[in-house]
Amino acid sequence: MKKFFSMVCACLLALSAQATDIKKYDALYENLPFQMEKVTRPQFPANEVNLKDFGAIGDGSSLCTTAFAKAIDALTQKGGGKLIVPQGVWFTGPIVLKSNINLHLEKGAVILFSPDDALYPFIDTSFEGLDTRRCQSPISGHNLTNVAITGQGCIDGNGEYWRPLKKQKVTDAQWKQITSRGGAFKRADYWFPTEGALKADNSANMNVPKTPASEEEWNEIKRFLRPVMISLVSCKNVWLNGVIFQNSPAWNIHPLMCENVLIEDVLVRNPSYAQNGDGLDLESCKNALIVNSTFDVGDDGICIKSGKDADGRKLGIPCENVIVNGCTVFKGHGGFVVGSEMSGGVKNIKVSDCQFLGTDVGLRFKSTRGRGGVVENIYIDNMSMFDIQTDVITFDLYYGGKSAVEVLNDGDEAKSQKVQKFKVDETTPCFRNIDINHVICRTARRAAYFNGLPEMPVSNIHIKDMEVNNAEYGIVINRTDGVKLENIKVSAKTHTFDAKNSKNVTVNDKTYKKIDEKGITLDF
């Protein structure tokens, strides 16, 4: 009885400490311009099991897939709890999480996923906002309640065995080492891991292939069907804490249609050359808190999505009620990004106190005709940036699948300047009602770029208290309605403000009702 009483007291103390710790985020909800429930940490039973007790060997070569499955099943039979992964390198196939499971990596623990695609069966899923078939994710969970990945260890997806590679993104030594595995070349400077992956790419919609006619054809293109590393679908009460997530086959962390999501103190890494190596893609989720985390990746850093085109509109689940605070993004196509898959809508997002260091774009809003969806009520405050490769802020409704650097190098930006006006319908994307305050950046190619559609201008964007030093170009706007710039300081080598094809543009208290194709040029 005494032992039982001690265990109960220990559990109550742990729960009390956890509840107190989550209160440190209470200030983030103060004066929010939208209603949002406070995100909570999931609670788990006190049960614990150790991976080693189920036959796992942490030598980096012994396959531990069965041990992970047995350990999770054993915990589930007890009602859930903590699966302890001790120090070691645990080589494994896919891990399927269950409700009330906390996958806990102790210091020095590495979960390393096998590159053997035979271990990853095909599943029906969603990728890049489209319903499709992919390989099973290294870590996945579906329709779960209370699920966590915590600790001080590292999860590595062995992604270089899955991803295509562009020569200009790597050193000669890296190129030689990776392409020596075989595979196929789309061009002399663009490599795929198999002939089948190249075949699929030649007919794909971005990274979603044309549906094969037979199972044999599916197997032929299997390496093209790269999974996201962490796939959590329709889960409630999700917690990621303290872990390093790195080297994913495609996107790194992908919560889809989840609710009450807490991501704190994680490090998300991918090589800068990782194709589609996004850090976090929060898609069609509700009530999420992303805090004090670091991203250094090969694509978008922190990205908000909600499905693509007809599939996304049919699902119709927006990404809403999200707070991002105190995060750092190093390499990446964008620091904080919305789109391009946003067909279900995005609303009620607050981003504050973040720093972007060396990213291609700081704040990136992107979409294109065909998406549909409304992005609105986005509030951004206190952004610090340095060495931004293109724009501090981008709104571009002519997104074509390339990074901002690739668009710049290929001259695609100029191609969207003279365009036909289309009829507004459900496929027309809309970006409106976005406030951006207190932005400071040292070194960027351009301070800001607005590129709306003739039929749907980017509208009601308010930027206040922004200072950009050492830029090549200032603020360029085209096809906007209701852009307001207040207390803006830009040090650039050219004019600091250029506008055309826009209405109701306010620059430091002076409003221009209509700006035609000839445009205007000003200096702040």
Residue ranges and their predicted role:
Residues 217-219, 278-279, 311-314, 369, ...:
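Outer-membrane beta-barrel domain signature
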Residues 2-12, 17-84, 89-102, 106-234, ...:
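Extracellular "leader-to-stem" segments immediately downstream of a signal peptide or signal-anchor
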Residues 95-104, 256, 344, 372-373:
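Short, surface-exposed basic-aromatic patches at helix termini and helix-loop junctions that form
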Residues 362-524:
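Extracellular beta-rich repeat passengers
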Residues 89, 257-259, 267, 306-308, ...:
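Active-site-proximal loop/turn and secondary-structure-junction residues that shape catalytic pockets
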Residues 80, 94, 114-115, 135, ...:
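Short glycine/acidic-rich loop motifs that flank beta-strands on beta-rich extracellular proteins
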Residues 107-108, 145-153, 236-246, 259-271, ...:
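Right-handed parallel beta-helix
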